[in-house]
Amino acid sequence: MAQVINTNSLSLLTQNNLNKSQSSLSSAIERLSSGLRINSAKDDAAGQAIANRFTSNIKGLTQASRNANDGISIAQTTEGALNEINNNLQRVRELSVQATNGTNSDSDLKSIQDEIQQRLEEIDRVSNQTQFNGVKVLSQDNQMKIQVGANDGETITIDLQKIDVKSLGLDGFNVNGPKEATVGDLKSSFKNVTGYDTYAAGADKYRVDINSGAVVTDAVAPDKVYVNAANGQLTTDDAENNTAVDLFKTTKSTAGTAEAKAIAGAIKGGKEGDTFDYKGVTFTIDTKTGDDGNGKVSTTINGEKVTLTVADIAIGAADVNAATLQSSKNVYTSVVNGQFTFDDKTKNESAKLSDLEANNAVKGESKITVNGAEYTANATGDKITLAGKTMFIDKTASGVSTLINEDAAAAKKSTANPLASIDSALSKVDAVRSSLGAIQNRFDSAITNLGNTVTNLNSARSRIEDADYATEVSNMSKAQILQQAGTSVLAQANQVPQNVLSLLR
């Protein structure tokens, strides 16, 4: 080896080794201080990528576990609401069993139906208001997906179903609906009659509703004017009394001619503005048409102006063809051909009333015709029908009986087999509750599996990126010794050029 001064090879070699030991010492100290074997990609590029993927999975699965717990909470909230709906249904069933007992009076059935209605309304309220984090869980059919994995498509679906009165098949549930109307019901409705069978008189008023085509009850009101379809009496409704005035009789097709002729004669013999008395009622000639007795006369009853129109009447042997009462209020008018006219300020309709005897019995087959539709009641006591459809007796909130047709009764009709309907509703609720219970158990299983997976992934990631302290402490001790030795040797190496100077002495 040459003896040189400019280049100290031993010193350079020692410095290089000293730098290596310094780097090892720094790495060991960094790992020991961070607890990680991989602090940057340079420590282990592949290991860093693998550990990073594990981290993504671990974080995703941890959140998925929380999602599954939220799913359990949703199912529990929904199931709790269904439990309350079930309680209401059980009470409705209990009341329905009570209602089917024949010992109940009408008031008992009404009280039972009132509570049933309240219970059904509570079911709808629970359905509309139950929600989880702003999501209504029973108001509509919905599939709620719960993410229970770290990747796309890893979901569990909760089937939320609409549970309300309508979806349970209990819409219109009624244990106190209208009953089929019979002739007995029809006869009993014609009461408070004096002398004649009156189609519209007294406290219970029946009329034909042209709009719906159903016979309905009309409560006593001060703004109705009626004409007796059997005897021609004019009847005005008053809360305190009924005023009747005989105008003319219409029990036969030719009856009433004398009375009508008397009015026509008064018109013919007078002039417009003249007054005359007929059967204790003062009439005024409003309009006179020609000299044949045609025209209009009017009178006032209970403050209501009523006009009688006489047309096509011959003073001779001809029969009366038509006579119509008109008023600003609702008017029911009897005419000699057995028809009566409805004046409802918008249109006039006709209906035929026949074969109702004065003693309130039904003679043969009684028919009421409205716009071609015949209401038929057989004298044998059979039910009343309209065009083959059964009529029903219903009671309003005030207790007034109403005769309604089959279509109108459909919404009010007592529920057929009410207990079976309730059992069906309970079965549907039970099915939904069972589904929610099963989904809760499934979520529990998913949470357990997610926990196991997260634990295993954490262990795998730890083996890749966590520092082994035994190894790192050993590496640090080794590096420290090398540092000390290197520093000492470097001092010796730096003294080697001094030996060359001895050659110059």
Swiss-Prot record:
Keyword Cytoplasm: no
Keyword Nucleus set for record: no
A Pfam cross-reference name: Flagellin_N
InterPro entries, alphabetized: Flagellin, Flagellin_C, Flagellin_C_sub2, Flagellin_N
Recorded superkingdom: Bacteria
MF GO annotations: structural molecule activity
Any one GO CC term of the record: extracellular region
Main location (coarse class): secreted
Keywords associated with the record: Bacterial flagellum, Secreted
Locations listed in the record: Secreted; Bacterial flagellum
Role played: Flagellin is the subunit protein which polymerizes to form the filaments of bacterial flagella.
Additional remarks: Individual Salmonella serotypes usually alternate between the production of 2 antigenic forms of flagella, termed phase 1 and phase 2, each specified by separate structural genes.
Record-stated family: Belongs to the bacterial flagellin family.
Name assigned to this protein: Flagellin
Natural source organism: Salmonella dublin
Lineage start: Bacteria, Pseudomonadati, Pseudomonadota, Gammaproteobacteria, Enterobacterales
